[in-house]
A protein has these predicted regions:
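ATP/Mg2+ or Mg2+-diphosphate-binding catalytic cores
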Residues: 2-5, 9, 127-180
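An alpha-helical support segment within catalytic cores of ATP-dependent transferases
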Residues: 1-45, 56, 110, 172-178
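Short amphipathic alpha-helical segments and their helix-coil junctions
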Residues: 17, 25-28, 62, 94-113
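Catalytic activation segment of kinase domains across protein kinase-like and atypical kinase folds
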Residues: 50-80
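Short, charged/polar micro-motifs that form catalytic or ligand-binding hotspots
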Residues: 67, 86, 116
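Short, solvent-exposed segments of well-ordered alpha helices
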Residues: 38, 113-117, 150, 154
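Active-site activation/catalytic loop segments of kinase-like enzymes and analogous catalytic loops
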Residues: 73-108, 119-139
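Short beta-strand segments
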Residues: 42-45, 62-64, 127
Length: 180
């Protein structure tokens, strides 16, 4: 399926559905205003095992803080689940979500925001993996790859497949399901 057709026939209709459903489920208390700082957390936004080193004692050191700042803990929770490098099984997803629910239990609307936001983050990641189709970002990847065998067409096919998989996963999401 060509990218333009995918965006028009798959992504856009799904985006409209997800946006409407998520908006209707979003807690009224935070729908039209910024989340107060006391409900935010420091977040690297690219938090995951792909950005850490495991020491000989088993401890983990996180290295990549490019997008570090204050944010809704829902973003940290969702990005950890949706990031393509994570690839968590259902059991680990449940453990992560349960731990995050416990950690942010002082926020009475955290779980509602998480449930409403999870499909939105899936849609976001569907677009992020398509960055390979943007010439300037593809060139950055080519330069960072360092090998002379960088195959743009092959990379685009891989990323396109990931985007379609993200959309399928979002389609199968029950918006009223508690993710924790």
């Amino acid at each position: 399926m060509e990218l333009a057709i995918f965006l028009e026939e798959v992504f856009d209709p799904l985006w409209k559905k997800v946006k409407n459903e998520s908006t209707s489920l979003w807690p009224e208390e935070s729908r039209m205003q910024n989340l107060p700082r006391n409900k935010q957390t420091l977040s690297s936004s690219d938090f995951g095992f792909h950005n850490c080193v495991k020491a000989s004692d088993g401890s983990l050191t996180f290295l990549d803080f490019d997008y570090f700042g204050w944010d809704d803990p829902v973003k940290l929770t969702a990005d950890f689940i949706w990031h393509p490098a994570m690839n968590l099984n259902v059991e680990l997803e449940k453990k992560w979500n349960a731990a995050m629910l416990k950690l942010f239990s002082g926020d009475p609307y955290f779980e509602e925001r998480l449930n409403a936001a999870m499909p939105l983050y899936g849609m976001r990641w569907a677009l992020i993996v398509l960055n390979e189709f943007l010439p300037e970002l593809a060139q950055k990847r080519r330069d960072a790859d360092g090998s002379k065998e960088y195959d743009l067409e092959k990379r685009q096919k891989i990323q396109f497949k990931k985007a379609t998989q993200y959309c399928e996963r979002v389609k199968n999401t029950d918006f009223r399901f508690t993710f924790a």
